[in-house]
Amino acid sequence: RIVAELRAKGIEIEIVSGDREDAVAEVARAVGISIWKSGQRPDQKIARIEELKKRGRHPLMVGDGLNDAPALAAGHASISPSSAADISQTMADAVFQGEALAPVVETLDVSRSTQRRALENFAIAIGYNVVFVPLAMLGHVTPLIAAIAMSASSIAVTANALRVGLEWQGRTRA
């Protein structure tokens, strides 16, 4: 289910594992992942991440083992379950509770929502600067009106940023 959700969001998924070929092949087949590599050392995992970065990708590394720690550090972003080795948790950008991968989808959704809000906030700030600063400079609005508009734009930016938290508050995934 998680793999299907990620694919629906346009995410390409690969397994790059240090485990045996038969085990990796079985997991990949069970979850529907066609690109996988087994028997990978930490340096090989890093090489794959670097290759993806050179192609303009932003790889998210998900790992839990000792040998995943260097690759977690190399990923554009990385997450690890709370059951992971301590070094993997330390090297990951975020740690999620449990072992199920549902938080990967939620993390992606929250990050995309945050990015949208940031772009909206830039638009609000630019809009203020394009409209009210020239009007104030030309004397078409009083300093009081310009100050009120500046405060209103700051409040609008803050309120818009708070929408991310409100959007995700109370949501849980099964």
Enumerate the language-model features and the residues they cover.
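Conserved ATP-binding TGD loop and adjacent catalytic N/P-domain core of P-type ATPases
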Residues: R1-E120, Y128, A174
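Short active-site segment of divalent metal-dependent hydrolases/proteases
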Residues: N67, F132, A156
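Short active-site-adjacent structural elements
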Residues: Q89, V104, P134-L135, T158
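Alpha-helical transmembrane segments of integral membrane proteins
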Residues: E120, I124, I145-A146
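Hydrophobic alpha-helical segments of membrane proteins
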Residues: F122-P134
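Structural signal for membrane-spanning alpha-helices in multi-pass inner-membrane proteins
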Residues: F132, A136-M137, A161-V164
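Membrane-water interface of transmembrane alpha-helices in multipass transporters/channels
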Residues: L138-A152
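Membrane-helix cytosolic exit motif
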Residues: M150, S154-A174
